[in-house]
Amino acid sequence: MFPMVTEFMNYGQQTVRATRYIGQGFMITLSHANRLPVTVQYPYEKLITSERFRGRIHFEFDKCIACEVCVRVCPIDLPVVDWKLETDIRKKRLLNYSIDFGICIFCGNCVEYCPTNCLSMTEEYELSTYDRHELNYNQIALGRLPMSIIDDYTIRTILNLPEIKT
């Protein structure tokens, strides 16, 4: 055949292929048109987090035995544990415990490997501040329990469950 005819046939095939791809994308767009919006109006509405959500760490000072397992299993050696050895009872006494949430990656290793369960993950995820030094929590700040989203009457909670198609 003539080169001009084969180029015209290739152009026609490319046009049909491009039209098919555009049509497929348009059909996907149309399939999303009848769904509910997934956007949450944040300050006034909040999603209820799952039970296994890894939020801010809660620390119970009385349970800690200063074994430093949390520091050893942390990938970035983040928790700072200050202790003093009591020679008369031959045990460690915890003086200070702090975590910098500006550096923490919320992996949960410290919670998982703690032998006394003095660490736990909460549902609190609003940790933003204007000063990064405010993200360094000591044992007093870590000991505060967060206000539950469900108990706050000023916020409409939205349960985040997967939709069941019928």
UniProtKB/Swiss-Prot annotation:
Any Pfam family the entry gives: Fer4
Localization per Swiss-Prot or TrEMBL: Plastid, Chloroplast thylakoid membrane
Annotated 4Fe-4S ferredoxin-type domain residues: 55-84, 95-124
The organism's place on the tree of life at top rank: Eukaryota
Cofactor names: [4Fe-4S] cluster
A GO-annotated cellular component: chloroplast thylakoid membrane
Biological processes per GO annotation: photosynthesis, light reaction
Cofactor binding, note field: Binds 2 [4Fe-4S] clusters per subunit.
Topology with respect to the bilayer: Peripheral membrane protein
This protein's UniProt keywords: 4Fe-4S, Chloroplast, Iron, Iron-sulfur, Membrane, Metal-binding, NAD, NADP, Plastid, Plastoquinone, Quinone, Repeat, Thylakoid, Translocase
Enzyme Commission (EC) number: 7.1.1.-
Transmembrane segments: none
Binding residue positions for [4Fe-4S] cluster 1: C64, C67, C70, C114
GO MF term list: 4 iron, 4 sulfur cluster binding; iron ion binding; NADH dehydrogenase (ubiquinone) activity; quinone binding
Alphabetized InterPro entries for the sequence: 4Fe4S_Fe-S-bd (IPR017896), 4Fe4S_Fe_S_CS (IPR017900), NADH_quinone_OxRdtase_chainI (IPR010226), NDHI (IPR004497)
Binding-site positions, [4Fe-4S] cluster 2: C74, C104, C107, C110
Record bears the keyword Metal-binding: yes
UniProt enzyme class: translocase
Catalysed reaction, written as an equation: a plastoquinone + NADH + (n+1) H(+)(in) = a plastoquinol + NAD(+) + n H(+)(out); a plastoquinone + NADPH + (n+1) H(+)(in) = a plastoquinol + NADP(+) + n H(+)(out)
PROSITE patterns: 4FE4S_FER_1, 4FE4S_FER_2
Family designation: Belongs to the complex I 23 kDa subunit family.
Subunit text: NDH is composed of at least 16 different subunits, 5 of which are encoded in the nucleus.
Function: NDH shuttles electrons from NAD(P)H:plastoquinone, via FMN and iron-sulfur (Fe-S) centers, to quinones in the photosynthetic chain and possibly in a chloroplast respiratory chain. The immediate electron acceptor for the enzyme in this species is believed to be plastoquinone. Couples the redox reaction to proton translocation, and thus conserves the redox energy in a proton gradient.
Protein name in the entry: NAD(P)H-quinone oxidoreductase subunit I, chloroplastic
Source organism (scientific name): Chaenactis santolinoides (Santolina pincushion)
Protein's gene: ndhI
